[in-house]
Amino acid sequence: MSRSINKVILVGNVGRDPDVQTTSAGTKVAHVSVATSRRIPREGALEERTEWHRLTLWDRLAQLAEDYVRKGDRIYVEGRMEYGSFERNGVTIPTAEVLVRELVLLGTPGGRTAAAEDMEEEELVA
């Protein structure tokens, strides 16, 4: 069988503070929305197009997101895509999310200092 790769790398801005919950087993999970932008030519000008990505972080990365990630922060994440679905009113709704395995805080609005900048890089990897 040949090997396959499912790897996503995103650099973008956090849309809102992380939504952090604890499972019944006591495991932390965080959901973060990140925006990425690109410029595309449209009628002689460049139009900016924004894409929103749903990120899911577990355990230590969820804790790091809860402690250090805020709306407006610029972050780098690596992970893999996962697809699923759920039912709502008898309709199947498809979902897509990035399961994050590495998180790096790149910058904060207004230059606020984040303690995450003092951590060694391996502390930000699951």
Where are these regions (language model features)?
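Acidic, gly/ser/pro-rich intrinsically disordered tails
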Residues: M1-I5, V20-A25, P41-E48, N89-T92, ...
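OB-fold and OB-like beta-barrel modules that bind single-stranded nucleic acids
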Residues: I9-R16, V34, K71-E82, V100-L103
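Short, acidic/hydrophobic/Gly-rich beta-strand patch recurrent on exposed beta strands
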Residues: H31-A35, R54-T56, A96-V98
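A beta-strand/beta-hairpin structural motif
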Residues: R42-D67
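Beta-rich strand-turn-strand
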Residues: W58-I93, L106
